[in-house]
């Protein structure tokens, strides 16, 4: 059996241009601190499954009900992924075929809604997601969208607003689950509101699935009608999507919405990677990993706060930290900086200069447009996979604060780069790839 390293050697010989670019990306991942909250590093076993001969096989349909022959082993692999997903999340039904979280969400809409129906989701600027009704997404074009947000004082979900909007607009579907919300989600509170107005309730747990699977965040599967997620992020699997439900009859509708409703042939090499990742997540070591993800994020948050950087909602309960950079601007202005305005766009570029990968992000009631933003989103999953602990995340917090508070000092930026390089050296990534 060939290994990922063998495959790269073959690629180097047959297509050196692609090989060189892959090696450059590998080096970038090794030499930078990956802090994008939606990214992680899959295991070598997941990489091996994705790079297997399963990529050759078409398998439209479901296990035991295919439209192509030669699927006997494909069926076993996909059924294994289904069974492991059900066990991991306590679901009665799982569909492992969605190519992405966005595809999973679209399949739910196709199964439950008609064009023109009303949906409710969190405002993108408050931590929602494009697929929850943004006007640039199909969800915002096909459906009537009502957005809820967070309380201006606490920056936590405003359930009074959610209830009032639900009573006023009577949505067919309420969506909970977010892309930039650092707090525990009260699924039971959403269930009560959905039941009152006769709405379906969908949880999108793409960001927190790994934490849910290990009990470090409440599980929406017993509460919500349907749950969607990606399989990477905190779940640490391949890039892909997953749909879960406690209702087998609803599961049949969801299956049809995936195929033939919105997709053709499933990506069975990716599904094999999902099966491997779900198996890894069922191990005790993964629960330890999830606990460390939260501890590391909280260590980072405490350091940033100690340095005078304000965090949205005042901290974090999960894997992500959202910085309100207006607090940095205030310090820069007080210190007489030539350019005192620190935006998400500027902070993103500064992070790149010191080899930290992050992303600008809107914050609740943001005065800046999304292309500029007033926030910086940081996450702990990838570096936790790499082996960093709270002490290292405290060091990273100091590095980030030094960079943000002294953005015009080349000496400070160079010192930050050296500190980042030392952390990368101490915690190597994918050494088996050479």
UniProtKB/Swiss-Prot annotation:
One of its GO terms (molecular function) is pyridoxal phosphate binding. One of its GO terms (cellular component) is cytosol. The modification N6-(pyridoxal phosphate)lysine is found at residue 233. Its EC number is 2.1.2.1. The keyword Cytoplasm applies. Pathway: One-carbon metabolism; tetrahydrofolate interconversion; Amino-acid biosynthesis; glycine biosynthesis; glycine from L-serine: step 1/1. (6S)-5,6,7,8-tetrahydrofolate binds at residues 124, 128-130, 249. It catalyses: (6R)-5,10-methylene-5,6,7,8-tetrahydrofolate + glycine + H2O = (6S)-5,6,7,8-tetrahydrofolate + L-serine. PROSITE patterns: SHMT (PS00096). It is found in: Cytoplasm. CDD domains: SHMT. The record marks 232 as: Plays an important role in substrate specificity. InterPro entries: PyrdxlP-dep_Trfase, PyrdxlP-dep_Trfase_major, PyrdxlP-dep_Trfase_small, Ser_HO-MeTrfase, Ser_HO-MeTrfase-like, Ser_HO-MeTrfase_PLP_BS, SHMT-like_dom. Belongs to the SHMT family. HAMAP family: SHMT. Catalyzes the reversible interconversion of serine and glycine with tetrahydrofolate (THF) serving as the one-carbon carrier. This reaction serves as the major source of one-carbon groups required for the biosynthesis of purines, thymidylate, methionine, and other important biomolecules. Also exhibits THF-independent aldolase activity toward beta-hydroxyamino acids, producing glycine and aldehydes, via a retro-aldol mechanism. Homodimer. This is Serine hydroxymethyltransferase.
């Amino acid at each position: 059996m060939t290994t990922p390293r063998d495959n790269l050697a073959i690629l180097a010989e047959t297509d050196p241009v692609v090989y060189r670019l892959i090696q450059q990306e590998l080096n970038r991942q090794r030499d930078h601190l990956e802090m994008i909250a939606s990214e992680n590093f899959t295991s070598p076993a997941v990489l091996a499954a994705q790079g297997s001969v399963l990529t050759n096989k078409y398998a439209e349909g479901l296990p035991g009900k295919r439209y192509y022959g030669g699927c006997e082993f494909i069926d076993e692999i996909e059924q294994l992924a289904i069974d492991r997903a059900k066990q991991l999340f306590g679901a009665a039904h799982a569909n492992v075929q969605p190519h992405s979280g966005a595809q999973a969400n679209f399949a739910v809409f196709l199964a439950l809604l008609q064009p023109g129906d009303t949906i409710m989701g969190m405002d993108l600027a408050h931590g929602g997601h494009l697929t929850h009704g943004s006007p640039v997404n199909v969800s915002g074009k096909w459906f009537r969208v009502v957005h809820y947000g967070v309380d201006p004082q606490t920056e936590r979900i405003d359930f009074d607003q959610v209830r009032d909007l639900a009573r006023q607009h009577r949505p067919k579907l309420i969506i909970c689950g977010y892309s930039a919300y650092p707090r525990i989600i009260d699924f039971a509170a959403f269930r009560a509101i959905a039941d009152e107005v006769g709405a379906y309730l969908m949880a999108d747990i793409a960001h927190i699935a790994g934490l849910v699977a290990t009990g470090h965040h409440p599980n929406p599967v017993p509460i919500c009608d349907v749950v969607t997620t990606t399989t990477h992020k905190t779940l640490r699997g391949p890039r892909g999507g997953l749909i879960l439900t406690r209702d087998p009859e609803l599961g049949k509708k969801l299956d049809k919405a995936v195929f033939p409703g919105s997709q053709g042939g499933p990506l069975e090499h990716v599904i094999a990677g999902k099966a491997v990742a779900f198996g890894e997540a069922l191990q005790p070591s993964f629960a330890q990993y999830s606990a460390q993800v939260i501890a590391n994020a909280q260590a980072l948050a405490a350091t940033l706060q100690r340095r005078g950087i304000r965090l949205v909602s005042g901290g974090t309960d999960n894997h992500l930290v959202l910085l309100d950079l207006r607090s940095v601007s205030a310090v820069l202005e007080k210190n007489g900086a030539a350019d005192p305005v620190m935006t998400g766009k500027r902070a993103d570029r500064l992070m790149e200069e010191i080899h930290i990968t992050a992303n600008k992000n809107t914050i609740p009631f943001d005065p800046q447009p999304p292309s500029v933003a007033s926030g910086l989103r940081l996450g702990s999953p990838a570096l936790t996979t790499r082996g960093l602990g709270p002490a290292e995340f405290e060091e990273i917090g100091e590095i980030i604060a030094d960079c943000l508070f002294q953005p015009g000092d080349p000496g400070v930026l160079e010192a930050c780069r050296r500190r980042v390089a030392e952390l990368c050296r101490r915690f190597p990534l994918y050494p088996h790839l050479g």
